[in-house]
Regions:
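Metallocofactor- and cofactor-centric catalytic cores in central/energy metabolism, strongly enriched
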Residues: 2-285
Length: 285
């Protein structure tokens, strides 16, 4: 890429980052926005269906139903449920790995840095164990056991984690989730052609997935991460490109599998690694 796409493509509140992107000799997602500015009107409205080999079907005033008979409401809800199930699956995958990492650390009797977070979860789950590592393993097992329940068996930790009045409303609405992994499978299956045409029913499934994703994929992932990474502390810190310190080796890590970073957290402070950094020109501490 020899020139910038346009003067507004990379506009950002972070001016150093904006200038950096504008001068890159390659294409970034910021530049590709320009080429994708014209959107498919059917796709934007959610009334395009590509679920079966008879499609794609698009809903218009002259053709209000797809070949399978689904109307706009069904197609929109079906597309939405598939997207929600897919996203939920990603987050449940993360909390599963995080719980397994906590369990592995407990079994090795090392790597527990946030005992306060561990004690908080143990109290919530009503786990009483003197040994910290046994306590951590049982906390991890409680999370994993819930994830692996069948769809028709409600997860046990939801009530312990949720705000009580809200839990009562979920119970009245019939949207308490079963096993989180099974709920993802159930949601995908429900989207199949001719299996369900009730948009309200599919949207209720989205709410169930939202509960399991929020409590397990988000809240519990963070609390389990605190056990192995240590509990976070509020502090003032630079953001954007200002985090880069030219006196040191700068490594940027991104992703959701934070508990997998614990190895790097330890390894990068070892003497042989710090010596290599000094040899590369990093400032000695």
């Amino acid at each position: 890429m020899n020139q910038c796409y346009g003067c507004t493509t990379c506009e950002s509140a972070d001016k150093p980052l904006e200038g950096f992107i504008k001068n890159l000799p390659l294409e970034t997602s910021h530049h590709r926005v320009e080429g994708q500015s014209t959107k498919c009107a059917f796709g934007l409205q959610g009334v395009c269906c590509r679920l079966c080999s008879n499609g794609p079907c698009r809903i218009t005033p002259d053709a209000p139903r797809g070949i399978c008979g689904a109307n706009a409401d069904t197609i929109v809800a079906r597309n939405f449920l598939r997207a929600v199930a897919s996203g939920s699956g990603c987050y449940i995958h993360v909390v599963e790995n995080t719980a397994r990492n906590v369990k592995n650390a407990a079994q090795k009797k090392s790597g527990i840095k946030g005992e306060g977070a561990l004690n908080k979860l143990a109290a919530l789950f009503e786990i009483e164990e003197e040994d910290m590592y046994v306590r951590a393993e049982k906390v991890a097992d409680a999370v994993l056991a819930d994830l692996y329940l069948p769809e028709y068996e409600k997860m046990k930790l939801v009530k312990k984690m949720a705000y009580a009045p809200r839990y009562e409303n979920w119970e009245k609405l019939g949207i308490l989730p079963g096993g989180a992994k099974s709920e993802v499978c159930h949601g995908v299956v429900k989207c199949s052609t001719n299996l369900n045409s009730d948009p309200v029913d599919m949207l209720k499934d989205c709410l169930k997935l939202g509960i399991s994703t929020g409590i397990y994929g988000l809240t519990l992932t963070n609390l389990l991460n605190d056990i192995v990474l240590g509990e976070p502390k509020l502090r003032l810190a630079p953001v954007g490109l200002r985090v880069i310190d030219p006196d040191y080796i700068n490594i940027m890590i991104t992703g959701h599998q934070h508990s997998m970073f614990t190895y790097l957290q330890e390894r990068l402070t070892d003497a042989d690694i710090t010596e290599k950094a000094k040899q590369a020109g990093a400032k000695p501490d």
